[in-house]
Amino acid sequence: MVENKKPSVLKPDLKDERINQDLRTKLLSDFYSYHHTTCKRRNQSVSEEKRSTIFKKWMGKNKKVLDLGCRDGRLTRHFIDQNEVVGLDIDKIALEECAKNLSIETKWVDFSIQIPLQTSSFDVIVAGEVIEHLPCPAITMAEASRILKPNGLFIGSVPNSYHFKNRLRVLKGNLIDNDQTHLRAYNVMLLKHYLEKEFIIEKLISSRGRSSFLSIAWFGRDLVWKCRNKKQLII
């Protein structure tokens, strides 16, 4: 059972520029472990069945797959069959659960800055409900492009913060997003802005939202993408 213990330090002295990456990783790990426990985010994944079906279809079999933000492996478990999967996450407690439950390789990493993996080493990278948590998604996407093989597949999803109901919420004076871990509110245009820097977008759909078939920008509750790496083989 995970202990519901508030992190001892949530706000380091930002004036001290010598705070190193290891301490940053530890602070973020404590924060996310606390958040996932208190907000009851463990052992669940948003739109799990629909997203896992889409991801499995797109990635296929016999692939080397990197799951960015695998957490406790709730979504990851759907595509480990006949694939070699490596999971990365900042939440150390959740990551230990993932390694134990799925018996896959995991790495405790703050991938918002750098991903310590070899260039052109993966066929597929998955980022399900991850990039909204990143302070600088352009850095992570550039790293994803580097790690992917030429023409490799980058798939993922992000909440569509500007779907119709959320726009009404804002008109009523409410916040567009009340999740304290979300650092960016994405719409179709912003998502394309980041993806197209490193990738070629093949598909952009929504896995939830009754009227999303009319317009994913207005009625899709999430945005689900399938991209190819722009990086080409050098012959």
Please give the residue ranges for each predicted region.
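Conserved beta-strand signature within the Rossmann-like core of class I S-adenosyl-L-methionine
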Residues: 152-158
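Phosphate/oxyanion-binding loops and surfaces in catalytic or ligand/nucleic-acid-binding neighborhoods
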Residues: 161, 174, 197-201
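A short glycine-rich, Lys/Arg-flanked "PGG" loop and its adjoining helix->strand segment in the class I
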Residues: 139-150
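A structural helix-start
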Residues: 134-135, 158, 162
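Short, glycine-/aromatic-enriched active-site segment of Class I SAM-dependent methyltransferases
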Residues: 162-182
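Conserved N-terminal segment of class I S-adenosyl-L-methionine
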Residues: 1-118, 124-126, 138-141, 156, ...
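Short N-terminal helix/helix-N-cap motif within the alpha/beta-hydrolase-1
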Residues: 135-139, 166
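Short catalytic micro-motifs in class I SAM-dependent methyltransferases
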Residues: 128-133
